[in-house]
Amino acid sequence: MAVGKNKRLSKGKKGLKKRTQDPFSRKDEYSVKAPSTFAVRDVGKTLVNRTTGLKNANDSLKGRIFEVSLADLQNDEDHAFRKVKLRVDEVQGKNCLTNFHGLDFTSDKLRSLVRKWQTLIEANVTVKTTDDYLLRLFAIAFTKRRPNQIKKTTYARSSQIRAIRKKITEIIQREASSRTLAQLTKLIPEVIGREIEKSTHGIYPLQNVHIRKVKLLKSPKFDLGALLALHGESSTDDKGQKVEREFKEQVLESV
């Protein structure tokens, strides 16, 4: 074996080793705020790269969508199967102000509702709120046994399904088109489902009636004042208020 330099071993790397910078050192933390229609306002934190040159951090945050459990927003475990989508519309300081962007059910809840020996009835309605939000609401309902029923199955006839679907459409249209988006988000979880169940009892008894999904199709032109009012931060009501103070006339002592 020839004795000599092993080029592979002696060959060193050119230049010094680059320092690896922690990517999180270039990021800032912002708080995500839910609208005042929910009981809990603090959703969580989000990270974004700091403003450098022409790239503004606020522009990167606007439009971000967060999916939050309604149970966390309302401090109520009964709503754990509902997921609310919130979209960042404005950034004020270190706070991201969000607005309602949609609602959905968890897949495990939807699977648990579907059972044998009953009829599943679905309907979807496109509605416009009074503040010009275009929404599509998806309703779901299941038939149930009548009192003192002996038969195992609870299948509804096609004519009954059509009548129930028509009733669902009418109720959703009436409730949604006469309210703002903020008012509608309060009704969606429970109120509309109970109203449908009560109204369709004469056609066929229903159970597990829910608005399972809400899809935001179109938003009106962005209005900062409306968003601040939604978050309870509007200062329009405080302007121009008369301040009541007692006026005491100063009497100068005669010299």
Swiss-Prot record:
One MF term in the entry's GO annotations: structural constituent of ribosome
Q: Work out whether the entry's keyword set contains Phosphoprotein.
A: no
Composition bias type Basic and acidic residues, residue spans = 19-28
- GO cellular component entries: cytosolic small ribosomal subunit
Q: Where is this chain's protein located in or outside the cell?
A: Cytoplasm
* Residue ranges the record marks as coiled coil: none
Entry-linked SMART domains: Ribosomal_S3Ae
The molecule here is called: Small ribosomal subunit protein eS1
